[in-house]
């Protein structure tokens, strides 16, 4: 499935290679947006822009010269309804986007999420607290005009479906399918046997990567997924390709640093280039 992604050619530009927009970040959680945006670029997006709280924008300007930033007004270290216009402008030219990394649980951030996600016209990956904003309100996502990919772990999916995480764990495929159908989305239920489903088609990851059991790797997966969407893959294929490449990158990172337990999310990002190639390591 990685071979389906368009490759860069002599006439490619940073814009034709796929623009990704990302909204999120809050005080104490700026790293999530940084990792998602760097992963998107490493996975082939030609241009990435982050919409972040204005009072935290300096963090991104200093730490991430490869990524454009838009400071969104309104909140005290978080995105809130007053940030909506700036967020929507950031997504206007995006070929794909991500909403939620590092968003935080401020009620205003959740209110923004429920308003702005419906208005974003680009294919969208929703992750982390972007998902939690729709706890018990999953059906609201079905009104989106563009494709949606949800990337929950069992706890987040439990909140979306208002079910105990243990029940999700006992019925992973059925739960993922239920969520996909209710939201009209592709669901990536994360785990060692990550499941990808659009409610009808199903794919299950068979590449074990214990190194991915560390903070930030979910943000890396979101970035990779958005990049493959921006490069032109349809949502189910983009999700499958990202899951495969993410697992490969986790294994590559463990080999490079010497032990799965020593891998950090940045190591996984650095391992994306060989993992994303169609002729990359085969498990």
Provide a role label for each language-model segment.
Residues 1-124, 128, 132-149, 154-283:
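Small-residue (G/A/S/T)-rich helix-start motifs and N-terminal tracts that mark the onset
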């Amino acid at each position: 499935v990685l071979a389906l992604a368009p490759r860069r050619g002599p006439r490619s530009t940073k814009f034709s290679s796929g623009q990704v927009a990302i909204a999120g970040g809050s005080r104490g959680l700026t790293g999530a947006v940084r990792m998602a945006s760097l992963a998107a670029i490493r996975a082939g997006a030609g241009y990435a822009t982050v919409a972040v709280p204005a009072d935290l924008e300096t963090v991104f300007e200093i730490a991430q010269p490869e990524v454009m930033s838009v400071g969104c007004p309104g909140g005290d270290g978080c995105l809130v309804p007053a940030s909506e216009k700036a967020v929507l402008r950031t997504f206007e030219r995006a070929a794909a986007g991500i909403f939620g990394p590092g968003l935080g649980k401020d009620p205003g951030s959740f209110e923004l999420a429920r308003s702005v996600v419906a208005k974003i016209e680009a294919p969208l990956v929703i992750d982390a607290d972007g998902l939690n904003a729709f706890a018990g309100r999953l059906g609201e996502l079905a009104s989106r005009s563009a494709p949606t990919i949800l990337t929950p772990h069992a706890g987040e999916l439990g909140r979306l479906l208002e079910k105990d995480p243990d029940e999700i764990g006992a019925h992973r495929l059925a739960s993922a399918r239920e969520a996909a159908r209710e939201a009209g989305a592709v669901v990536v239920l994360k785990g060692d046997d990550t499941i990808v489903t659009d409610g009808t088609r199903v794919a299950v990851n068979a590449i074990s990567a214990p190194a991915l059991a560390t903070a930030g790797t979910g943000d890396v997966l979101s970035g990779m997924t958005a990049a493959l969407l921006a490069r032109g893959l349809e949502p189910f294929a983009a999700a499958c390709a990202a899951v495969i490449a993410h697992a490969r990158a986790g294994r590559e990172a463990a080999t490079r640093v010497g032990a799965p337990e020593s891998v950090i999310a940045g190591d996984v990002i650095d391992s994306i280039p060989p993992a994303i190639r169609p002729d990359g390591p085969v498990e």
